[in-house]
Structure formats: structure tokens, C-alpha cells
Amino acid sequence: MAAVACNNSNPLIEGWNTPYGIPDFGAVKEKHYVPAFEAGIAQQQAEIDAIIANEEAPTFANVVEAYEASGAILDRVVGVLFNLSETDGTDALNAVMEQALPMLSSHSDNITMNPAFFAKVDALYQDIENLGLNQEQKMALKKLHNSFVSNGIALDEASQARMREINAELSSLSNTFGNRLLAENNAFAAEFGVTISEYGEAMAATADRALREKMFKAY
């Protein structure tokens, strides 16, 4: 019963019935994000476990399509948080990102370093020309297969552990860079009334030489 109550009180887990599926931003609070990430990761892991446990021969439908259909909660929470963080990077959202990114990095590694899951994907990939797939399906299979290879499925255990560390560090550094870039853009807009992306137009439009010099130095 507790889990049901949690789901009903968290729009990121429960979802929303809005036109075109637009997120109900007004209902989403900072406290909802981490529990939604935890629920989303658990949901997708269970869905992947079901793909692996399927005793039928691997097919595009029961492996690739099943994987692409997984992670509905995680897709929802990532879509909301990342878009808000990139446009309205408040301290509260930044704190959420710092909690969420290591969880996401670990979850992604758990997927692409899973030998049982890769075995099913690889079986399809090795027989790709005989599966009757169209070009879009072939591309989807190749992309999924490459996600395992590029993330170290063939590495030994020690090397995979190092890969996990690198992925976590890259995720953290990318977030830090994004936060600093947004802060610089906001500071520029606060001082000059235009964003950095509007810099070129503003420089061409203003006749104030002193202002252009000031904007140039700030840019």
C-alpha cells in the first residue's frame, strides 16, 4: 500500500493526462525527482530482466523493440529534469542533478555491461542480414549493439570498473560545464538585456559604441 500511495503522490511516476502529453510542470516539485529516478531505474531493470529471462529465441520484437519500449518512468523524469535544468538551473535543481547523474550513469553501465542482455543483442546482430529487417530496424539494431561495444562489454572486469569510473566522472563534468554555461548566459542577459545567442544581432543593431565595446569584452 505504501508504494501505491507514493506513486499517486508523485506525478513523475504516475504521469499526467494533458494535451499532447505536455508535462504538468506545476505539479512537479524538487522532492519528486529522486524517488522517480529510483522507481524508473527499478522499472527498466525489471523490464530488461524480463527480456533476458524470455526463453524464446531472440527476435527483433522481443529484444530490440522490447528494450525501446522499456523505461517509461525514467524517460519521463529525465525529459522534465534535464530540460528544466538546462533552462532554469536553480540551486535546488542543480542539487537534484548531482544526486541523479550518478544513478543514471550506474544504471546505463549496468545495461550495457550486462553479458546476458548483450548475448541476445549480439545473436541478432550476427544474423542481421537474414532477419528480414528494413533499414530503420537494421539501424536500431546496429545502434543498440554499438552501445554495448563502445561502453566496454568486451573488457575484462577491472577495465569495466575503470570504465564505470570514467563514465561517472564525464557525467559529473558535463553537468558542471552546463551549469557554468547557463550561469554565464544568465549573467550576460541580466547586464545587457539579451542572451549570448542574441549577441550578434544586438551588436549589429546598437549604435552605442561604448555599449558594443562592453558587450564584446563580456562576450
Positions of PLM-derived features:
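Zn2+-dependent metallopeptidase catalytic domains
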Residues: C6-Y219
